[in-house]
Amino acid sequence: MRKLSWQHIVLIVLAIILILWIISLLLCRKPVRPTYQVPIIQPMQVIQPHQNDIDPAWQTTYSPNNTDNQNQQYVLYYFNNPSCPHCKNFSSTWDMLKNNFRSINNLSLKEISTDKQENEHLVFYYNIRRVPTIILVTPDKNLEYSGNKSLEDLTQFIRSNMNQ
């Protein structure tokens, strides 16, 4: 048998140490735990009218439990966004609709701007995904209007669902 030089012995020892180190890494590896992340969707915070800093004369928030709506049997919500071109086109029809139904005592018409932070709870509650959206709240159900946004069709929708 041939004698190994000191350089070969050092290389063999280093190779053995390297192999043992790799085996220990593979076998004794700690499980990787994900780091804590802040949830992407923050819990919604409902602003009560008496707790915010907005002057009550300027408040435009309406909630399903608002005392203003409790004496009204029916509420027609119009969800819009000022930057939406379809909402701008529909605004004249909405104004005529408000004038036509102004004299009906048990119907309240509410215009809700989806870009205002104080209306976020309504947008979430009624699951508003697009604007303009019209929802008629009756004593027993909520009806989303999906037809033509003409004055005649909306009037027919309101009258037919109020006379059930």
From Swiss-Prot:
Q: Per the annotation, which location comes first and is thus the protein's main one?
A: host cell
Q: Which residues are listed as membrane-spanning?
A: 8-28
User: Do you know which CDD domains this protein is assigned to?
Assistant: PDI_a_family (cd02961)
Q: Which cysteines are joined by disulfide bonds?
A: C84-C87
Q: Name one GO biological process term.
A: protein folding
Alphabetical keyword list = Disulfide bond, Host membrane, Membrane, Redox-active center, Transmembrane, Transmembrane helix, Virion
Instruction: Give yes or no: UniProt keyword Transport.
Output: no
The topology of this chain with respect to the membrane is: Single-pass membrane protein
Where does the record place the Thioredoxin domain? Answer: 36-163
Q: Which GO terms describe its cellular component?
A: host cell membrane; membrane; virion component
| UniProt entry tagged with the keyword Membrane | yes
Q: Gene3D superfamilies given for it?
A: Glutaredoxin
Q: Name one GO molecular function term.
A: protein disulfide isomerase activity
What Pfam families would the database entry show?
Thioredoxin (PF00085)
Taxonomy, superkingdom: Viruses
Tell me the compartments it is located in: Host membrane; Virion
Q: What protein family does this chain belong to?
A: Belongs to the thioredoxin family.
Q: What is this protein called?
A: Thioredoxin domain-containing protein R443
**Natural source organism:** Acanthamoeba polyphaga mimivirus
